């Protein structure tokens, strides 16, 4: 589905990402984790078209999408949510959803129910809590035509209730055959829901495997947890 091969990026003299290679398999939840400064956000931005890679290739379903502009990435089939939400806070829930797709009342209500956002469609987005705004952004991303759903730090700033709801939402999407790529800092969260976990540190992939293998890996414990 998604393939990164030898992707590298420098900012001045700093190596943000160095020869990063991994794959996100179809119909899986794959999570990219690591400590602050590991390079996760840079990988997300490069894959989203927000930052240009210095070298390497990125492919989606076999098609080269390396260094395409963000709207071209979306057209290729990647739908995204961001750590800092990109919803329009001055617009209603309905209008935010209509930006993603011209749809009808029933489809919008069904989508909101699927992400546990039980609010009237005419509610202004600024009246929602931060966690509810994250859910609205997720609903909007799901409405867009896509083959890959990519989420940047979906648990950041949300309360325990929404955090648990996110687990259920992602599990349900997985059962529906969705392909999901998470960028996360919360190891416990991804351990519960991921088919595969990729661990980064200092710009490099240091471990890739099933949650049970990652949890026991000594290098991961040393680098990520400081043990």
Task: Write out the residue ranges for each language-model feature.
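Glycine-rich phosphate-binding loops of nucleotide-dependent enzymes
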Residues: 1-3, 7-227
């Amino acid at each position: 589905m998604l393939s990164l091969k030898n992707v590298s990026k420098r900012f001045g003299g700093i190596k943000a990402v160095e020869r990063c290679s991994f794959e996100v398999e179809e119909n899986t939840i794959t999570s990219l984790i690591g400590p602050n400064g590991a390079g996760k956000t840079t990988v997300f931005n490069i894959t989203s078209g927000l930052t240009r890679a210095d070298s390497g290739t990125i492919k989606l379903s076999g098609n080269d999408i390396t260094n395409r502009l963000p709207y071209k990435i979306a057209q290729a089939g990647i739908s995204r949510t961001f750590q800092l939400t990109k919803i329009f806070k001055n617009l209603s829930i309905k209008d935010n959803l209509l930006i993603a797709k011209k749809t009808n009342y029933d489809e919008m209500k069904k989508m909101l129910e699927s992400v546990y956002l039980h609010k009237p469609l005419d509610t202004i987005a600024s009246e929602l809590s931060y966690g509810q705004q994250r859910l609205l952004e997720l609903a909007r991303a799901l409405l867009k035509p896509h083959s890959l759903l990519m989420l940047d730090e979906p648990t950041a700033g949300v309360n325990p209730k929404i955090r648990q709801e996110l687990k259920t939402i992602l599990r349900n999407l997985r059962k529906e055959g969705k392909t999901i790529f998470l960028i996360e800092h919360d190891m416990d969260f991804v351990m519960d829901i991921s088919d595969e976990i990729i661990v980064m540190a200092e710009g490099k992939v240091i471990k890739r495997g099933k949650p049970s293998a990652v949890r026991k890996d000594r290098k991961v414990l040393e680098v990520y947890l400081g043990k």
